[in-house]
Structures are given as C-alpha cells and as structure tokens.
UniProtKB/Swiss-Prot annotation:
This is Vacuole membrane protein 1 homolog. Phospholipid scramblase involved in lipid homeostasis and membrane dynamics processes. Required for autophagosome formation: participates in early stages of autophagosome biogenesis at the endoplasmic reticulum (ER) membrane by reequilibrating the leaflets of the ER as lipids are extracted. In addition to autophagy, involved in other processes in which phospholipid scramblase activity is required. Belongs to the VMP1 family. Keywords: Coiled coil, Endoplasmic reticulum, Lipid transport, Membrane, Transmembrane, Transmembrane helix, Transport. One of its GO terms (cellular component) is membrane. Residues 7-33 form a coiled coil. The gene is vmp1. Its main location: membrane. Disruption phenotype: Mutant cells display defects in the protein secretory pathway and in organelle biogenesis, and are deficient in their ability to initiate development upon starvation. The contractile vacuole, which is necessary to survive under hyperosmotic conditions, is non-functional in mutant cells.
Length: 403
C-alpha cells in the first residue's frame, strides 16, 4: 500500500511540475517573432496555413449549396469581366466604380483588423486622397473632374459659377469615406465571431463543471465563499453593455478612440446580438466616424486655410520661412499640369513609397507573429488541460488509498 501511495504522489508532482513548465513556456511564446526566429516562425506559420486550408475544405464539404453559390458568383463575375459581348459597354461604365468600392472596403478591413496593429489606411490612403481632392477643387474652383481611372484629376475647362462649397467637396469624397468606413466595420467581425464561439464553448464547459461539483459536493449558500471584485465586475459588465445597447455601441464606434479596438472581442465575449453589434458599428464607423474624419481633412487642406496656416507657421518659426510655401506651390503646379505617367518620382514621392513599404511589411509581420504565437499558446493550453484532467482523475484514487 505504501509503495502504491508513493508512486501516485510522484506522478502527481510530475504532472504539476509539467504544468508549471508549460505555463512558463506560454510566456516565452510571446517572444517567437519572424524577425528573431525566422525559420521557426515560418515553419509554424506554414502549419497554420495547412490547418486553415484543411478546415476550409471540411467546412465546404458539409455545405455544398454555399460552395455552389460561391462558384456560380465567381463564374458570372469572370464572364462579365473577361468574356466579350454587349454587356462589356455597361461593365466599362461601372467597372471603375466597382473596383474602387472593393479597394476602399479592403483598405478599411486592413485598417480595422489586428487589434490596434492594423494598417492605418486612413492616414496612408484615404486621408491623402481627400486632401488631394480638396486641393484640386479649391485650386480649380470646380468639382467637375474625375477622381478615379486614367482621366483622373484633369483640370476642367471652366470654373463653376459661385465657387466650390465645403458640401460639394464632401459629396465628392463621401463614397470613398463610406466604403472605407464599411470596411472598418467588417474588420470587426472576425474577432466578434471568434470571441462569441469561445465564450459559448466556455459557458458549456463551465456549466458542466459546476453541475459536476454540485452533484459531488453540495454546498449551502451560507457556506459559499464571497466573490472577489473581479468576479463581481465580470458579472456586471454584460448588464452594462446590455443597458448601453445599440446607441451605446454606436457612440463608441462614432468617436475616434483606441478603446473601440477591442469592441469585436468584447461584444462577442458578452454575447451581444449580431445585428445590434454590427448595425451600430456600421453606422458609427461608416456614416459618422468616417465623415467626421473626412470633414476634418477637407477643412485642414482647403487652399485658403492651408495658406493661412503656412503663413502663421513661417511667421512664428523663422527657420521655416520660405521653405513650406515652395512645397505647396510645387503641388499646385502638379495639379495644373499634365504629368507623364512615366516621369521620374520626386524625392518626397520615393520617401513616401518607402514609408508605405515599411508600414505594410510591419503589418504583415505582425499578422504572422500574432498567428504563430496564438497557435503555440493554444497547443500549450491543450496540453495543460489534458494534464489537469489526469490530475483530477488521480486525486480520488489517492484519497481512497490514503483511507
């Protein structure tokens, strides 16, 4: 009996030691990055791609109708774009608009995903686009020019009578702002669904565990330990979100703030209904927030406002006198002249391209790093859960043998 007890206790200690080692390794997983461990990170990222591909194949195997409709849509799109026919004249008319919609929605998604490490496409793309439209409209005193396609930003033959108003410029850029905002709302969906699924699984496991504990050892309410502050707060948060509801989420989504980066995870975790979450997020981000940012850029890059600001800066900082104004004049000359597409880029243009390249590279690396870290931590969590279940099975045996 004594020998048997010693073996059981030894196994229990080994399991606890292994759990501790895995917990420590989980912390070290955060240091696995493409920059420091390129071979290891690339290897695990390929495993993730393989698992994702297998999961996708299994998903569509159980949903043949969905696969059929996706294939049908892709086939019709291919025929409409590439097969010659009468429909091509209509496609030519709307193809630029469709491609631009896809472009801005895609940039919005890239800006929203990544939990704060996403590609800040408003600063890199939408903001400069709105600024360019504003500069062109106020310089030419007209909004009768294309902003997309081969014939974009060509000076109109005549100026508009009565001048260009703020609202005219806003109408010129509002579709780009709307589609970009829609993309940022769509980018909140993956973390919402992941958190919602994890929460539902967790609730099921938690309910089963509580039921098992109640069956094995019933406890009176008086004997139950007092709940900690964190437990009490976690119970009140869902009620708080429920009380805020649609308009609370709408208010958070409408104001540019870093607190909304975790909105998808938060709402998914507390099981906020999908349409309440997505509807409020879509209106807040696409209609309100994107237009607030667009209005700010239009006001800031109006030629008159810009000239006043530059004059003020040059008066206050003598070092910058006659250095900012020539840059503005150069941009005005670019707008008023037809520049060859093959003309060499300026130093500023090359520097901006380098900034874009570095930002996109960092964004892609952060996706790889976070995916690999999450994959490795999940593997460790599964091992820990398995060891804990073994430990729970051994503890009753140990109790019986001690008796």
């Amino acid at each position: 009996m004594g020998k048997s007890n010693t073996i059981v206790l030894s196994n229990e200690k080994d399991i606890q030691l292994r759990i501790q080692q895995l917990e420590e390794r989980k912390e070290k997983r955060k240091n696995v990055k493409l920059l420091f461990s390129p071979i290891k990170t690339t290897k695990y990222f390929l495993y993730i791609l393989k698992d994702t591909l297998v999961s996708g194949i299994r998903y569509f195997q159980t949903r043949p109708f969905l696969l059929f409709f996706i294939a049908l849509f892709a086939s019709l799109t291919f025929i409409a774009v590439y097969v010659p026919g009468e429909h091509q004249k209509y496609m030519g008319k709307y193809s630029d608009l469709i491609s631009d919609c896809i472009w801005w929605v895609g940039l919005g998604v890239l800006s929203s995903i990544g939990l704060g490490t996403g590609l800040h496409t408003f600063v890199l793309y939408l903001g400069p686009h709105i600024a360019k439209v504003t500069l062109a409209a106020t310089e030419w005193n007209s909004v009768n020019f294309n902003v997309y396609g081969a014939n974009s930003f060509i000076q109109p033959a005549t100026a508009m009578i009565g001048g260009v108003s703020f609202w005219m410029i806003l109408q010129k850029v509002q579709w780009a702002a709307l589609f970009w905002g829609a993309g940022t709302a769509i980018g909140e969906l993956p973390p919402y669904f992941v958190a919602r699924t994890a929460r539902l699984k967790g609730l099921k496991l938690e309910q089963e565990k509580k039921l098992k504990e109640q069956q094995e050892k019933p406890i009176d309410e008086k004997d139950q330990p007092k709940k900690g502050l964190l437990e009490r707060l976690s119970e009140k948060v869902p009620a708080l979100i429920g009380n805020l509801g649609f308009f609370g989420i709408l208010a958070f989504a409408s104001i540019p703030n870093p607190l909304f980066d975790l909105a998808g995870i938060t709402c998914g975790h507390f099981l906020v209904p999908f349409w309440k979450f997505f509807g409020a997020t879509f209106i807040g981000k696409a209609v309100v927030k994107a237009h607030i940012q667009a209005c700010f850029v239009i006001l800031a890059f109006n030629m008159e406002t810009l000239t006043m600001v530059i004059s003020f800066i040059e008066d206050k900082i003598p070092f910058l006198k006659n250095k900012i104004q020539p840059i503005l004049e150069k941009e005005r000359q670019k707008l008023n002249s037809t520049v060859s597409a093959n003309s060499p880029k300026s130093l500023v243009g090359l520097a901006w391209d380098c900034v874009l390249f570095l930002m996109i590279s960092y964004f892609l690396m952060s996706i790889v790093d976070s995916s690999v870290q999450e994959y490795l931590i999940e593997k460790d969590n599964k091992k820990i859960e398995l060891l804990k279940s073994k430990l729970e099975k051994q503890q009753p045996k140990e109790t019986k043998k001690t008796k």
